[in-house]
Amino acid sequence: MADPLDLFAIDKIIETAECSIEPVIASEASIVKKIDEYYKVADTVDSITLTSDEDEEFDWTEELHKEEAGEEHIQHVIRAILKQAIIEDVHEVNFEQVEEGLKVVFKKNGEPSDKGTIPAILNSAFVSKLKTLSNLDATVCEIPQLGKLCFKVENAMLIASVSSFPTIMGERISLKIYKPPKHLDKIIPDEKQRSIISHALNNPGIILVCGSPLSGKTHMIYSLLMEAATSGKNIMTIESIAKYELKGVNQCELNENVGFSMDKALRYVEFQSPEMIYLEGVKTRDAFEFLSELFYNDKTVITEFMANNMTDLRQKLAFEDFQSFKTLITCLIFIHSKDSVEVFDKETLQKYLA
C-alpha cells in the first residue's frame, strides 16, 4: 500500500481478510527489487548443457509438452531448439510461418531440414519472446529488424544474430549462430600459411576471405582481427552486427534506423585514421572502389566474398568490375570446410586468377 500509516485502510483489510497485519515501511526501489527477484522471468535463454548421454537423440519438440504455456515455457522451448542446433552442429535456424504454426528449419551445408513445428497457438508468444531476448522491438512487425541473442553453452558464451522479416504469412525469423574466434594456430596449423597471413596483416593490401554460405568466414575474420589486435594498430570494423567483442579493436555496428548506413560509414571512417579496416559483406561497385582507395592510402583491408569453390571464385572475379580489385589482393583465404583451408599469397593468386 502507498501509505502504511493509513489505519482506516489497514483496519478494512484486517476485517476483510480476517488476518492480523504488521505494517512495514520500505522504499519503492527495494519493493520493486523483491518483485523482480521472485516473479520476473529472466531475459536470458540460460545455460545449455551438453553432457548428457541422450544428447544424440535429443528432440526439442518434447519440450512443448512439459509444462503449461507461459513466458518461462517459451524460453525453455527456445533453449531446446538452440541445444539441438548445437548438438547437430547447425549454424542457421529458420522459423517460417505455415498454416499449422511456426516451422523450424535447420540449415546445414546449404541443405534445409524440417525439425518440427511450433503450434499456431504459441506463434505470437514465441516470436515476441525471441525478439525480446534479441533486443528487438516485439511490438514492431511491419519492418525488418536485426538483433543479437547471447546464450551460454557449457562455459562458452555464444552469439547468434537474429533477423526478423515481414511476410504475408507473418514474420519470418532467421537465426545464425557464431562460435567464438580462436587463435590462428588452432585453425591454420600450417606454419607457412600462417606466415603468409602474418605478412598480409602487417602490410597494406586486401585480405580476402572466401567460402560458401555458413562455411566459417566470419569466424576466420574474427580470428584474423584478434591476431592483429596485438600489434597496437588502430583497427576498425564496419559490421551489420558485432558478433563478439574483440579487445583492441574498434568495432562499429551499422544502424539503418538512425540513418547510419554502410555508405555513411565509408564516408566518415577515414577521419578516424584507421590502419586496418574490416568491411562486412562488400557487394556494390562503390564499395569495391572504396577498398581500392584504402589500399592506395596504405591501409590493410579485410573483407569477405561468397564463392562455393575456387572455380566459382574465378568465374565471379572474371567480370570487368573486379579487374582492378583482383590486383590488390595480397592474401586469399579460402575455406572449403572447417577442416580444409587454403591460403594464397599475392604472387600465387595472381597466376591463378589471371
Feature names for model-found ranges:
Residues 1-30, 38, 53-210, 215, ...:
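N-terminal "pre-motor" subdomain/linker immediately upstream of P-loop NTPase catalytic cores
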Residues 33-50:
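Short, low-order "capping/linker" segments at domain edges
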Residues 33-38, 105-107, 150-152, 248-250, ...:
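Short secondary-structure transition/capping segments
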Residues 46-58, 119-125, 168, 264-268, ...:
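Short, basic, helix/turn surface patches
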Residues 202-207, 213-214, 222-340, 344-349:
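Switch/coupling sub-region of P-loop NTPases
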Residues 218:
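Walker A/P-loop
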